[in-house]
Amino acid sequence: PAGFQRRFMFDDLMARRTARQQPRLYWRGKGVGGSTAVNGQLAIRGVLDAFDEWAAYGATGWSSQDVLPHFIAIEDDLTFGNQPLHGSHGPIPVYRAPLSDWGPVDLALRQAALDAGHPWHDDLNAPDAEGVCTFAMNSRDGRRVSTNDAYLDPARDRPNLVVLGDALVDRVLFEGDAATGVAAILPGGAQDFFAAE
C-alpha cells in the first residue's frame, strides 16, 4: 500500500549497477533495521562458488572460505545448525517450513518442478544446492527477526550505544582499506560519525 511505502520505504532512492545503466527506483527499507524490517525474510546465502570467483578477480577476503565463517556465526539454524556448514548460536534464526505446512499452490508448484526434472534439496544454503527447496527464512515463532531485533535490541542498554532517528547514512568513510565511520544526513545538516575501534 502507498501509505506503507511512504512511511517505511524510500520512494525516491535512485540507483544503478553499472555506469551505463540509467538510474532506477531502488526500494530500500527505512527505519531501525533498514530493509530487514520490510523484506521477505529470506535467509538465503550467496552461492559460495561466486565468492571464489570474486576472490579470483582480486576481491581479497571474499572467498568462500573467508565468508563462510561469518555465515555460520550469524545463524541459529533450527534445521541444520548441528551440521558443519551451519550455525546454531547466532542472533539470526533460520527456519524452513515443513512440507506439511505448505499450501496447495506451493505443493502443486513443487510437484511441477520435480516433474520437470529439477532436483529437490532440503537445504538451499548448501554449496551444491540447486533446484527446488523450502526457502530458509529469518523468523522465529512466526515473527520477523530484523537486524534491529537481532543486534540492536540486545545492546540497547549499553552506555556506548546511541540510536539516532531521522538519520540517513550517506556513505561509509574509509582510511585506506579500513572503514572508520559514516557520513550521515540529519535534520540539522550533515555530520560524520567515527568508530572508536
What do the predicted segments below correspond to?
Residues 1-72, 183:
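N-terminal glycine-rich phosphate/pyrophosphate-binding loop and immediately adjacent elements
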